[in-house]
Regions:
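Loop-centered beta-sheet repeat module
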Residues: 57-96, 100-101
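Well-ordered beta-strand positions in beta-sheet-rich domains
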Residues: 80-82, 109-112, 151-153, 184-186
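A structural signal for short hydrophobic beta-strand segments in well-ordered beta-sheet cores
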Residues: 88, 118, 175-176
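Flexible linker/loop signature enriched in Pro/Ser/Thr and Pro/Gly
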Residues: 103-136
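Polybasic (Lys/Arg-rich)
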Residues: 138-230
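Bulky hydrophobic/aromatic content
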Residues: 1-71
Length: 230
């Protein structure tokens, strides 16, 4: 747990850490030795303010609304708003807050490292059903949310298929290993940005078959990258 985020193990998480230590000791393991033997490596991890995380996590657990200031990287705007926290998400080494935004009157996902101020309010948080949260925030690939879901059909070369066929990109994915060794993967997505960014690292070993809009976006991204080297 210390390796997840050492500065964030405040009063809310310390009891959990102590309980895990007790369980390991009962099994004959020393917690200190376990920490030395297990390493968690994070690439692209963004640091967050421990005080901000403490306020957000405590309000989430205690079911209070939060007044926060958040920087939207897509619009480059900083906006103050009140939210009803629902859950905290750790995704690829970074922390996010799923919440009901009282300003937009809709579900939103906030990167906690982009929150500059946070204050727990006395008002009780609005409760949103798990089904509604999953429908709004959890249908597509990656961290970006949306309800307008399409399906990406991707074909990986034989050399790349050895790895990709054993990976889970989405709970509803469909994968088929072809006789020639290539691997076709169908993945639901609601926002193409993260999917394209991930596909670019595979270079010539992956092809977007459809939809045409995603294929065109991928082509433009590859052409833009190529121009940097010509």
């Amino acid at each position: 747990m210390e390796q997840l985020e050492p500065t964030l193990l405040g009063p809310q998480l310390e009891p959990l850490g102590m309980k895990l230590d007790q369980i390991m000791q009962q099994q004959g393991f020393e917690a200190a030795d376990m920490s030395r033997r297990i390493k968690l490596l994070h690439a692209g991890k963004r640091p967050i303010d421990a005080n901000i995380f403490s306020v957000v996590s405590r309000a989430t657990f205690e079911r209070h609304q939060i007044a926060l200031t958040h920087f939207n990287r897509s619009s480059s705007k900083t906006i103050q708003r009140t939210v009803s926290p629902i859950e905290i998400v750790l995704y690829r080494g970074n922390w996010y807050l799923n919440a009901w935004c009282h300003l937009r009157e809709d579900l939103r996902r906030f990167s906690i490292d982009a929150i500059s101020t946070a204050e727990s309010k006395s008002e009780a948080a609005i409760e949103i059903s798990e089904e509604e949260v999953a429908t709004k925030l959890g249908q597509g690939y990656g961290i970006f949310s949306g309800t307008n879901v399409d399906t990406a059909v991707l074909q990986f070369s034989k050399e790349r298929a050895e790895w990709v066929q054993n990976e889970v990109w989405h709970p509803d994915q469909v994968g088929v290993l072809k006789p020639n060794g290539a691997y076709t993967l169908e993945v639901p997505y609601a926002d193409e940005r993260e999917l394209i960014a991930d596909l670019l690292k595979y270079g010539h070993t992956v092809e977007v078959i459809r939809p045409a809009s995603l294929r065109s976006s991928m082509k433009r991204a590859l052409e833009a990258a190529l121009r940097l080297y010509t």
